[in-house]
Swiss-Prot record:
This is Fatty acid conjugase FAC2 B. A motif (Histidine box-3) lies at residues 304-308. Pfam families: FA_desaturase. It comes from Calendula officinalis (Pot marigold). Belongs to the fatty acid desaturase type 1 family. A motif (Histidine box-2) lies at residues 131-135. The keyword Ion transport does not apply. The lineage of its organism: Eukaryota, Viridiplantae, Streptophyta, Embryophyta, Tracheophyta. It catalyses: a (9Z,12Z)-octadecadienoyl-containing glycerolipid + AH2 + O2 = a (8E,10E,12Z)-octadecatrienoyl-containing glycerolipid + A + 2 H2O.
Length: 372
């Protein structure tokens, strides 16, 4: 198959008819050992990433500034990207903990997840609770939690104004730099809550949470405050610029990776969104897409369909589990191997809003479009 034909096939829409299989059919196809999550194996991956992260921090803190200026201008960006990737890998382990896919012990998962996410300035329990709602309502126009597309009827002046090479570049840079932080702080790309109030992951009274979760949200905030205070103390000793170089920029890289990965997993011309007249859980879970984000080297970013179907499966079993269900999924499974930056550019250009097709009998099914 030629490149043009292959690119066209990637953009073919997934079926919207009722799947010829049930959820239990998929579960039976997954090898039972894929659901096992031995603590020893999970700890191996955790300590591996912690050790690499600490080595990178140590080298950056003690040696890069000693290099000649022309050489440090090369080494610093290499460090920023490498450390950003490994911070992202650690963040993903914390995300695994929130799904109880790190070990068989929930208290272990919550302890590890809290420590990791707090170190990466993510309120663990707050994100765990909102992310649970995302998995419960994936690709629902009304109830999903993140990356909810705009309808054509909504204000789109800014989106259309920026749909040109310069505008797209500015939009991409802004979203990659600030998108993740804006989501955590202000629920950017999240759903609109009818009850009002500040929809922030840092606000215990936020409509994102119910009453039984608010104390855990406060506990997460305390953890973040401790880390921020530690950062402040480090800055008073080392100065702002060294701290920004060693931790700040890698954190921005991590944030960009997380925003881009989740955006690409839920944004594609071939993937539909549904309103309440058409949505059901299986439809939503199947409306995700597997991508090859090789630079991240984390299976949860590659195999996202299986993650939404069975979030308890640990990332090191995700590939095997995916291969087991692909024959059953058939055309309902979507994979796009388009290179990362090319895919990000295409999706930001082509996926501006969603609307139902003209003449479509079922008006509750929405597809990405970009026509004015």
């Amino acid at each position: 198959m030629g490149k043009a034909a292959s690119a066209k096939k990637v953009l073919e829409r997934v079926p919207i008819s009722k799947p010829p299989f049930e959820y239990n059919d998929l579960k039976k196809a997954v090898p039972p050992h894929c659901f096992s999550r031995p603590l020893s194996r999970s700890l191996y991956f955790l300590f591996h990433d912690i050790i690499v992260t600490c080595i990178l921090f140590y080298v950056a803190s003690n040696y890069i500034h000693m290099l000649p200026r022309f050489l440090s201008c090369i080494v610093w960006p290499v460090y920023w990207i490498s450390q950003g990737v490994f911070l992202g890998r650690l963040w993903m382990i914390g995300h695994e903990c929130g799904h109880h896919s790190f070990s068989n012990y929930r208290w272990v998962d919550d302890t590890v997840g809290f420590l990791i996410h707090t170190a990466t300035l993510t309120p663990y329990f707050s994100f765990k609770y909102s992310h649970r709602n995302h998995h419960a309502h994936t690709n629902s126009m009304e109830y999903d939690e993140v990356h909810i597309p705009k309808r054509k009827s909504e204000a789109l002046y800014f989106e259309f104004l920026g749909n040109n090479p310069i505008g797209l570049m500015i939009t991409m840079l802004c979203k990659l730099t600030f998108g993740y932080a804006a989501y955590i702080m202000f629920n950017y790309t999240g759903k609109k809550h009818k009850s009002g109030g500040l929809a922030s992951h840092f606000y215990p009274q936020s409509p994102l949470f119910n009453d039984s979760e608010r104390n855990h949200v406060l506990f997460s905030d305390i953890g973040i405050c401790i880390v921020l205070y530690a950062c402040y103390r480090i800055v008073t000793v080392t100065g702002a610029m060294p701290a920004f170089y060693v931790y700040g920029i890698p954190w921005v890289i991590m944030s960009a990776i997380l925003f881009a990965a989740t955006y690409l997993q839920h944004t594609h011309p071939s993937i539909p969104h549904y309103d309440t007249t058409e949505w059901n859980w299986l439809r939503g879970a199947l409306s995700t897409i597997d991508r090859d984000l090789g630079f991240f080297n984390m299976n949860k970013t590659h195999y996202h369909v299986i993650h939404h179907l069975f979030p308890v499966i640990p990332e090191y079993h995700a590939q095997e589990a995916t291969e087991a269900i692909k024959p059953i999924l058939g055309q309902y499974y979507k994979y796009d191997g388009t290179p990362f930056l090319k895919a990000l550019w295409r999706e930001m250009k082509e996926c501006i809003y969603v609307e139902s097709d003209e003449g479509q009998k079922k008006q509750g099914i929405y597809w990405f479009k970009n026509k004015t």
